Amino acid sequence: MAKDDVIEVEGKVVDTMPNAMFTVELENGHQILATVSGKIRKNYIRILAGDRVTVEMSPYDLTRGRITYRFK
């Protein structure tokens, strides 16, 4: 998948699940299942419920995403 094809949206973490999975509520009200990107995992950045995050989504599956940034 090319980098141009991703959809970036902001959302809020609603729930944490096992295996570094999170339920994220997007700005438009939809809820998706998101996982943590490699750089966040590598740098041990903690993500908790209530955090604002940026999520990358594939245009082919709009129910899953990858958390790429946690706002301070």
UniProtKB/Swiss-Prot annotation:
Example GO molecular function: rRNA binding
Protein biosynthesis listed as a keyword: yes
Main location class: cytoplasm
CDD domains: S1_IF1
Pfam families noted in UniProt: eIF-1a
The S1-like domain, residue ranges: 1-72
Keywords assigned: Cytoplasm, Initiation factor, Protein biosynthesis, RNA-binding, rRNA-binding
Keyword RNA-binding belongs to the record: yes
InterPro entries: NA-bd_OB-fold (IPR012340), RNA-binding_domain_S1_IF1 (IPR006196), S1_domain (IPR003029), TIF_IF1 (IPR004368)
Location relative to the cell: Cytoplasm
A GO CC annotation given for this chain: cytosol
Protein family per UniProt: Belongs to the IF-1 family.
Task of the protein: One of the essential components for the initiation of protein synthesis. Stabilizes the binding of IF-2 and IF-3 on the 30S subunit to which N-formylmethionyl-tRNA(fMet) subsequently binds. Helps modulate mRNA selection, yielding the 30S pre-initiation complex (PIC). Upon addition of the 50S ribosomal subunit IF-1, IF-2 and IF-3 are released leaving the mature 70S translation initiation complex.
PANTHER family linked to this entry: TRANSLATION INITIATION FACTOR IF-1, CHLOROPLASTIC (PTHR33370:SF1)
Subunit structure comment from the entry: Component of the 30S ribosomal translation pre-initiation complex which assembles on the 30S ribosome in the order IF-2 and IF-3, IF-1 and N-formylmethionyl-tRNA(fMet); mRNA recruitment can occur at any time during PIC assembly.
Protein name (Swiss-Prot/TrEMBL): Translation initiation factor IF-1
